[in-house]
Amino acid sequence: MKAVAVFPGKPDSIHLADLPEPGVGDVPDGRGVLVEVLRVGVDGTDKEINDAEYGAAPEGYDFLVTGHESFGRVLEVGANVREIEPGDYVVATVRRPGDSIYDQIGLSDMTTDETYRERGISLLHGYLTERYVDAAEFIVGMPAALSEVGVLLEPMSIVEKGIEQAYEIQRRLKVWRPARRRRRRRNFGAPGDAGVEPAGARRHDAGPHRTADA
């Protein structure tokens, strides 16, 4: 099976690599989900990995398959998977739980581990390949109506987290009273839309995750 990979630490090393075919049996306890990749987002993170700024190959490999923004269709599920069925459209998450207290309570995005595993970024192969398998816990179902934009779910989650954290920081002031405008702007994340201006909004900063079909 073909995949797009880099040699971490070597600039401009992007190349085609061969991977063994994945199967639902690769995941223990009958919880595997085999996915056909339909789209992969390519953003600044992937560029920086190819520039050798960071990135780490999985154990036993000297290359790293890139691509952390995925969208695909389920081909097969393990015997103990009930929440997802073959034919479903799905997106896979990126980071995997580690050992910190935040990982243990389901907040791996807030991990304090110095080293963590992220598909297509650090210690785990990514999704820029023909097929992949992962545990059902890391697979998010997508309505068929969103199939054309489903690959944007991962970068959108970063925007959502930024807004959520801005609200959380403000709530700690105890007397925060966000004023809502009478006329709401139609564009997502408009400055001042709900009393919060996303970071970079005034600069029209697209941020580090710029997505395109691969």
Feature-to-residue mapping (PLM):
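Cofactor-binding loop segments of dinucleotide-utilizing enzymes, especially the Rossmann-like FAD-
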Residues: 8, 38-40, 183-185, 208-210
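Conserved SAM-binding loop of SAM-dependent methyltransferases across substrates and taxa
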Residues: 190-198
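Short N-terminal strand-loop motif that marks the start
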Residues: 1-69, 130, 170
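NAD(P)H dinucleotide-binding glycine-rich loop of Rossmann-like/cofactor-binding domains
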Residues: 97-179
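Hydrophobic/small residue at the entry helix of a nucleotide-binding pocket
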Residues: 158, 187-188, 212
